[in-house]
């Protein structure tokens, strides 16, 4: 039993490979065997393993999928598309599937996907029988009647048992229970069925035993063996004299399968010698005849005619075996038996059958193929068969319809329909194909099958515009949202592949996005305006419209260019731009001597429209009744028609209309007031009549004049702003931190007195201030001047011009006094100015520039931007950013060009006047006592007000008029030498009183205020523009001696003196100034020229000692005054 179960669940997988190669399609037969009644889901085969040799030849074997092409019984087996596993999908019953056929199989086809590399596998699964059925009789009791006179050996056919199994599992034999009178013999019919015949083996005697009951058993040979039984109930009757007899015990008949119903097959004839009822014979089928025979054939009980009651089919049943009996009507009648064998003859009565297997999820008669698929793409599987045999069953298959498809045979009567060309759905979307199958019988029979191939769309066509460029026009002054036009693109693809969406690609028109000008409806391509168009602003708009389809895999697009021309409308009136108009009125001057044809003026007109809308004509509509003037309508030139000398009138009011040629026309009306005036010299008629001579237009003169006035006003505003900024700084709170920085605010003037110490001598050589080395590292490195070196310097620099800069403090300029040195300034004697000062004809006014105790004498470049009225636009002040441009002719440019950049730098040292600041200054601000030094009383010795470079500010001197103060101020120097001062000018200061010193000191004190009044105060605020010199100057400010604070005094006086005495040159050797011819004639210069170039502030005593060694004479006051007058004259000349 266990072996039986094992055999039932055994999967017999024998693959018989039959490969047919045709082009690129491989057909391969695979056969498997399974037993019926296996569990659902049992795996039969794995195609991925069984056809691995074929799959390895494909480009991508791992991506291959399997698709089963179903037939009628296909639901019994299923195929996994990914793995190719064939498994049982439903219960398989061989007896139900194939009945008694010995060969039972399930056939279907499997394709590989994708179809570009199609492989076809034909699968045949043979279903093997298991012994799951027992033989059965149709009747549990079989009655049999036998005459007691029946001879030994008499045969009586018995009912057959039925076993649906086949082979060894089917009915094999019969057996009869043990007895002495009867036996059985097993016989086989022509169809292979087995039946038993009952044989009388011993004479019967009804008087001994009238009936018998025997068991008839039918058995198979299956494992386990199965059997079925029935009871034979035999009755023994009295004997009858004669029984009917057939002419033959058996008959064989040939029956054409196409024989019609009612055909007489056999006329049975049985004879009985008896008479009367005993001689009348009745014909009938034997009791054990199968129901199928009774349904197919019919026998006439009286005549014995066997006829066809139902059509037979050779393909279903090839033969029939019929048992017929004849029995008389007498009592105890014994029937006679006859066997009739009917063989069905095959004829060509079956047309070929065509089955088309399409890979269609829906309709059975429609196959779908994607356009663009390569040649030999799978379309359908065709299977043809003919139930006839021989030539009647041989079939010829053909494909009709279109040359784009072909029929390719794979095995037996199976075919493939493949594409024979690349298909294009846009050219043809559907094909009707016809399969014709014809057998070789006579006459030949054929079948026809139609099906449809529909081409699936792919997104292989981009949207296409009718034109690559569209040009449209629209009038200006349109309303926003106005419809412009529609651009349409067509896409022959289907569905989303053909759904077109329109967009405008991003571009810019006059700096604005195109989407602010026009928009497009994405569904239909309608273009609308988004704004009011102005032809004068933009006359043409060009943009690109993109049409894109909605393909899912990829989207295709195409572009077209749209040119939108904006048509001009006459919406602008002519505008007169010349001559200059005021309230549409212009004044025209005409010389008295103007002859006929004199060009009075030309009206210049501008019309922003274009074309005819911009064309205009001019005409005089009134004021010219006497035809004194003529006007060219095209050029709008006005000429005199008569001589002005002959016209008594001196003024005309001409009304002129300028009208364009638009529709409707627009015009402008102006009034020209023409006035006649006399020239000092009459204009010649030739010059008047010459139209070609260019004359300066009045309007151009006005424009130039306005420009010049604006420029002058701008300069005045800049100067005014500079002065205001400086005065505003005076109101700010003072801060010691700021005072220590590079820029110091101008404090309030502490004193109105004039100090002779306001004159400071600053020696220069060749127009260049002494420059300290940038790389001085220690005080010891400071150069010193030896007398021996001075002599060599004097000979080497014989052509150098040593100038003395006299810096005069501007503390004492009176409020009502202002003097600027120009070329037009008349000569002013110093003695006159001194006399005015002493006589009190003017009063000094306060100056906010401070005195020598409160000023640092330098203005830092980094603070000069505070006075600037310009902004770089970058948020920060930059080098060179000031109110004066380097290219302009300003005093600061001349000063820079002459080498005085160092005068405007500061060293950041705290002046002595600021040492009174306390910690409260940092918190509460500074008071006047903080920044105002104690003022000295007027001293006869100028040294008390003298600033010597390199020296610290002296302490507050006591007010005295004796010359002892001069001696007190003069302290020994570090070298042990006596301090030299300006009074000595090369000589030692005497210890006794000197009237000459007193007069000289008084004179210098008064000259201080004179120079302050002679020079412009605004020049004191100029700053450098060279950022590089700033850092250089800061390096040079470091003093060589400990505890000393020095710096170069600077100011406008230094600039004036420099301008007078120097003639600087540029790097190219070209003089920078305009006074190169002025040669200084001062008696000071021979002595000052001996000062070396490397002069330092701390070497001032050495200079004086050197000068004293030269034994220079001291000039008196009158000479000094004359020299100063000479200085003033040279300054004015330069």
From Swiss-Prot:
<feature type="compositionally biased region" description="Basic and acidic residues">
    <location>
        <begin position="868"/>
        <end position="877"/>
    </location>
</feature>
<feature type="domain" description="Cadherin 1">
    <location>
        <begin position="28"/>
        <end position="137"/>
    </location>
</feature>
<keyword id="KW-0732">Signal</keyword>
<feature type="region of interest" description="Disordered">
    <location>
        <begin position="941"/>
        <end position="1004"/>
    </location>
</feature>
<keyword id="KW-0472">Membrane</keyword>
<feature type="glycosylation site" description="N-linked (GlcNAc...) asparagine">
    <location>
        <position position="269"/>
    </location>
</feature>
<feature type="domain" description="Cadherin 2">
    <location>
        <begin position="138"/>
        <end position="246"/>
    </location>
</feature>
<keyword id="KW-0677">Repeat</keyword>
<feature type="region of interest" description="Disordered">
    <location>
        <begin position="868"/>
        <end position="888"/>
    </location>
</feature>
<protein>
    <recommendedName>
        <fullName>Protocadherin 18</fullName>
    </recommendedName>
</protein>
<dbReference type="Pfam" id="PF00028">
    <property type="entry name" value="Cadherin"/>
</dbReference>
<dbReference type="GO" id="GO:0005886">
    <property type="term" value="C:plasma membrane"/>
</dbReference>
<feature type="transmembrane region" description="Helical">
    <location>
        <begin position="700"/>
        <end position="720"/>
    </location>
</feature>
<feature type="glycosylation site" description="N-linked (GlcNAc...) asparagine">
    <location>
        <position position="559"/>
    </location>
</feature>
<feature type="region of interest" description="Disordered">
    <location>
        <begin position="769"/>
        <end position="800"/>
    </location>
</feature>
<dbReference type="GO" id="GO:0007156">
    <property type="term" value="P:homophilic cell adhesion via plasma membrane adhesion molecules"/>
</dbReference>
<feature type="compositionally biased region" description="Polar residues">
    <location>
        <begin position="791"/>
        <end position="800"/>
    </location>
</feature>
<keyword id="KW-0325">Glycoprotein</keyword>
<dbReference type="Pfam" id="PF08266">
    <property type="entry name" value="Cadherin_2"/>
</dbReference>
<feature type="signal peptide">
    <location>
        <begin position="1"/>
        <end position="27"/>
    </location>
</feature>
<dbReference type="GO" id="GO:0005509">
    <property type="term" value="F:calcium ion binding"/>
</dbReference>
<keyword id="KW-0106">Calcium</keyword>
<feature type="topological domain" description="Cytoplasmic">
    <location>
        <begin position="721"/>
        <end position="1134"/>
    </location>
</feature>
<dbReference type="InterPro" id="IPR015919">
    <property type="entry name" value="Cadherin-like_sf"/>
</dbReference>
<feature type="domain" description="Cadherin 4">
    <location>
        <begin position="361"/>
        <end position="465"/>
    </location>
</feature>
<keyword id="KW-0812">Transmembrane</keyword>
<dbReference type="InterPro" id="IPR002126">
    <property type="entry name" value="Cadherin-like_dom"/>
</dbReference>
<keyword id="KW-1003">Cell membrane</keyword>
<feature type="glycosylation site" description="N-linked (GlcNAc...) asparagine">
    <location>
        <position position="103"/>
    </location>
</feature>
<feature type="domain" description="Cadherin 5">
    <location>
        <begin position="466"/>
        <end position="576"/>
    </location>
</feature>
<feature type="domain" description="Cadherin 3">
    <location>
        <begin position="247"/>
        <end position="354"/>
    </location>
</feature>
<feature type="region of interest" description="Disordered">
    <location>
        <begin position="1022"/>
        <end position="1083"/>
    </location>
</feature>
<feature type="topological domain" description="Extracellular">
    <location>
        <begin position="28"/>
        <end position="699"/>
    </location>
</feature>
<feature type="region of interest" description="Interaction with DAB1">
    <location>
        <begin position="892"/>
        <end position="1134"/>
    </location>
</feature>
<keyword id="KW-1133">Transmembrane helix</keyword>
<dbReference type="InterPro" id="IPR013164">
    <property type="entry name" value="Cadherin_N"/>
</dbReference>
<dbReference type="InterPro" id="IPR020894">
    <property type="entry name" value="Cadherin_CS"/>
</dbReference>
<comment type="function">
    <text>Potential calcium-dependent cell-adhesion protein.</text>
</comment>
<feature type="compositionally biased region" description="Basic and acidic residues">
    <location>
        <begin position="1027"/>
        <end position="1038"/>
    </location>
</feature>
<comment type="subunit">
    <text>Interacts with DAB1.</text>
</comment>
<dbReference type="InterPro" id="IPR050174">
    <property type="entry name" value="Protocadherin/Cadherin-CA"/>
</dbReference>
<feature type="domain" description="Cadherin 6">
    <location>
        <begin position="582"/>
        <end position="688"/>
    </location>
</feature>
